[in-house]
Amino acid sequence: MMQFQRDLEASLEAVSANAQELLKSLKSRKDVQDLNASLPKDPLDNCDAQTQAARAQLAEAATRILQLSIRPQEYLEHLQNGYQHLTCFRWLVELNILDHLPHSGTISYTDLARKASVPPMQLRSICRMAICNGFLEEPEANQVRHSRISALFARDESYLGWARWMVNYSVPAAYKLSDATRSWGETVAKDQTAFNLGMDVKVPFFDHLRQTPAMKDAFAAYMRNVTSNATWGLQHAVTGFDWASLPRGAKVVDVGGSLGHGSIAIAKEHTHLTFVIQDLPETVAGARKEMAQNDKIEASVKSRITFQEHDFFGPQTVKDADVYFLRMICHDWPDNEAKVILSQIRAALKPGAQIVIMDTILPQPGTISVLQEQQLRIRDLTMMEVFNAKERELEDWSSLMQSAGLEISRVNQPLNSVMGLLTVRSAGQTALSGTNTLTPELVAAVSASTGSADSRPVLIAGAGIAGLCLAQALKKAGIDFRVFERDSHIDARPQGYRLKFEADAAQSLKNILPDDVYEAFELSNAVTAVGETDFNPFNGNIIHSRTGGGLSGKKGLYATFTVDRKAFRTQLMTGIEDKISFGKEIAYYKTDDATSTVNAEFKDGTHVTGSFLAGTDGLHSVVRKTCVPNHRIVDTGAACIYGKTVMTPEFLARFPEKGLRFMTVVSDIAPMLQSCLIGDSPVTLLLEPIRFSEASRARYPELPPDYVYWALIGPKERFGSQEVTSMKNFVSLDQAAEQAAKLSLAVTEEWHPSLRALFELQDTKQASLIRVASTIPDIPSWESHSNVTVLGGSIHPMSPCGGVGANTAIVDADALAKVLVEHGTKPPVNAIAEFGAAMRTRAKRNIWRSEVGSKRMFGQKNLVDCSEFVF
């Protein structure tokens, strides 16, 4: 109650003081209304700044008084006035009533209805509703005339265009916002917006705009008025950034600059600058024509401005600019798209270059005038309704910049401007500052968003098994992280299908995974059957077969789980989907000892800073090449085709039944004379049936049909060295898969038909051919770093013949997670060194096991005698 009284009293005092100031100014003005003028003028036109300030404060106080004086029971009545007034306004605009209203004097409703060809009773009711809201006047009974408000629309065609834009496009879109939410929920799709529902169109806004001339004209009128409005005016672009500090001849790129009005305004004031205005081809063509025909632009300005066709989602082609200027660009796009725009610019930044963003900075509620905040909230909702985009608070801007590898160095919120100016640089080059127009809360928001090393996430390069296991372990421990995967999505390429985990990996998984994820993992596994059957490839007869035996107990592989790789990776992503970014390949990284941080640069031009970097990015690891530059990876001389054959009725009828019980091995040894040339090097087929229990399928219906996993491995010469080398030249994964499938048939051409059914009925899109790489068992130590390490296949790749590569990676992830949990994300160097030493010991044992298997399966040499692997 007391707060209500204080607010009412303050608003009344503001009304009184500012009304008196406004009246005093108006009475002192020399210019008086011209009684012979054709249209009424606004008495508040051409007032000085002090008077305009008083007017704005009066409007603000009056608005607050209205809000305070309306009772809750009257709120809906107040809304009724709003939508009925809007309905009447649209009626007057769309039926061109203003065209028939005389510029001076009055006209009867009867005569106006006849001129406009509308029903007289409708006209009178609608005009009187408009009069209630100040749009028209009725000085005497049944006689209507322009008010100072309607006169503006009769005087300025662009305002009428803006009005048409509002009632025909903005309002229908706004009305459908709840329907859009109901239909699509949270989405960034440009063709799933309230605008699409309101206009009943299937294409995004700008596509429809290009196809609809009337809409394009209305939108252009709207934009002209936006840019001419003082609060949106270009003068703030001229004065809001220190353009004078740029060197003579400095280049400014106006990204998405449309007709170039912003650059022209700046160029007029700062004659030492040159400008490149970028936009889409159609826009650039119109802009060039308009500038050529505009005699009001001086030749000295035109000579310093060029236009360039450019799509800001593509690579930025101007790489020598001093400033990239984005005015009202980012707010049209959700964070992912805005990040792409900024990342493309960041990739082109030369040292010292800056990005100047002029766009809306949403305030915290109640921190600015209610009328100004209303306009900003309107823009925020409009972005949502039309583009599934948003206006951003300062913290949102800072987060967006960080995601694109940028940092805000300065924020300026000009007085009486609805847009602020953000000065942005590449991350690590900034020193945050602000102007006295910033509130302490806004400055604090920027400071908080930059973060300290302790608050920065662990960066995980690679969303393979090691990377995802580490991520789950960190999540379980409450440590922030981000995962970056080079592939575009989880199924971007075949990566093998079956994995077998032994006791050590099973225990690590139990340590790593939350209880619910571990339970789901157990239930999604395939049925494990222990044993081996060996076949003669040429007659299809069984050579050896044994259930259990050496593959069980303490004598062999200790097989605990049989896992479908895709199902396993899906389980590993459970609960951390929002932390994984696909299509992110690291180009390089650098550490900063002063801040104890690591900065990763991606090939798409984006950047991220973290407290620690874990390289799990596979054989081609960029992290390993930087962290352990002399690490030895050898070429085993083998190639391997991985494949998958679904257990269809036809396959089950053709393939030997006893070959589908457990692990099956088929060894094709070279004939006598051929072995003289290439050695007695066999090609070996390993296969295993992957079957899921009824309980697993009931819980996870998305599990694949039962299938046979197989791997055909042998010397590259048996596959054709040229074929193996040429695989990387295929332009698509489908082509490479098809060629690998054909190669599997060629290599097994003389095998028994029953066994060849495996290859003849394979899913040809799932085949993949790889060269088999490994490191040597005795991995040399390397200099450790407190911010970076490598693990899994990134540092100790091994032949699949041992079947323990994934096991080793899982245990690595568990071990590293324990280090980070114990010491935090800035562990001492000795802790990382101890982790590395233990990992090398573990890897040595498993690499040796793979080496033994490789010698038996394809005649591999000792790993230390193998040549270097050529990437």
Swiss-Prot record:
<feature type="binding site">
    <location>
        <position position="806"/>
    </location>
    <ligand>
        <name>FAD</name>
    </ligand>
</feature>
<dbReference type="Pfam" id="PF13450">
    <property type="entry name" value="NAD_binding_8"/>
</dbReference>
<comment type="function">
    <text>Dual O-methyltransferase/FAD-dependent monooxygenase; part of the gene cluster that mediates the biosynthesis of cercosporin, a light-activated, non-host-selective toxin. The perylenequinone chromophore of cercosporin absorbs light energy to attain an electronically-activated triplet state and produces active oxygen species such as the hydroxyl radical, superoxide, hydrogen peroxide or singlet oxygen upon reaction with oxygen molecules. These reactive oxygen species cause damage to various cellular components including lipids, proteins and nucleic acids.</text>
</comment>
<dbReference type="InterPro" id="IPR036188">
    <property type="entry name" value="FAD/NAD-bd_sf"/>
</dbReference>
<dbReference type="GO" id="GO:0044550">
    <property type="term" value="P:secondary metabolite biosynthetic process"/>
</dbReference>
<feature type="binding site">
    <location>
        <position position="569"/>
    </location>
    <ligand>
        <name>FAD</name>
    </ligand>
</feature>
<dbReference type="InterPro" id="IPR029063">
    <property type="entry name" value="SAM-dependent_MTases_sf"/>
</dbReference>
<keyword id="KW-0511">Multifunctional enzyme</keyword>
<comment type="pathway">
    <text>Mycotoxin biosynthesis.</text>
</comment>
<dbReference type="GO" id="GO:0008171">
    <property type="term" value="F:O-methyltransferase activity"/>
</dbReference>
<keyword id="KW-0808">Transferase</keyword>
<feature type="binding site">
    <location>
        <position position="279"/>
    </location>
    <ligand>
        <name>S-adenosyl-L-methionine</name>
    </ligand>
</feature>
<keyword id="KW-0503">Monooxygenase</keyword>
<feature type="region of interest" description="FAD-dependent monooxygenase">
    <location>
        <begin position="430"/>
        <end position="871"/>
    </location>
</feature>
<keyword id="KW-0560">Oxidoreductase</keyword>
<protein>
    <recommendedName>
        <fullName>Dual O-methyltransferase/FAD-dependent monooxygenase CTB3</fullName>
        <ecNumber>2.1.1.-</ecNumber>
        <ecNumber>1.-.-.-</ecNumber>
    </recommendedName>
</protein>
<keyword id="KW-0520">NAD</keyword>
<keyword id="KW-0489">Methyltransferase</keyword>
<dbReference type="GO" id="GO:0032259">
    <property type="term" value="P:methylation"/>
</dbReference>
<comment type="similarity">
    <text>In the C-terminal section; belongs to the paxM FAD-dependent monooxygenase family.</text>
</comment>
<dbReference type="InterPro" id="IPR016461">
    <property type="entry name" value="COMT-like"/>
</dbReference>
<keyword id="KW-0274">FAD</keyword>
<dbReference type="InterPro" id="IPR036390">
    <property type="entry name" value="WH_DNA-bd_sf"/>
</dbReference>
<feature type="active site" description="Proton acceptor">
    <location>
        <position position="331"/>
    </location>
</feature>
<feature type="binding site">
    <location>
        <position position="485"/>
    </location>
    <ligand>
        <name>FAD</name>
    </ligand>
</feature>
<keyword id="KW-0949">S-adenosyl-L-methionine</keyword>
<dbReference type="GO" id="GO:0004497">
    <property type="term" value="F:monooxygenase activity"/>
</dbReference>
<dbReference type="InterPro" id="IPR001077">
    <property type="entry name" value="O_MeTrfase_dom"/>
</dbReference>
<dbReference type="Pfam" id="PF00891">
    <property type="entry name" value="Methyltransf_2"/>
</dbReference>
<feature type="region of interest" description="O-methyltransferase">
    <location>
        <begin position="1"/>
        <end position="429"/>
    </location>
</feature>
<keyword id="KW-0285">Flavoprotein</keyword>
<dbReference type="InterPro" id="IPR036388">
    <property type="entry name" value="WH-like_DNA-bd_sf"/>
</dbReference>
<comment type="similarity">
    <text>In the N-terminal section; belongs to the class I-like SAM-binding methyltransferase superfamily. Cation-independent O-methyltransferase family. COMT subfamily.</text>
</comment>
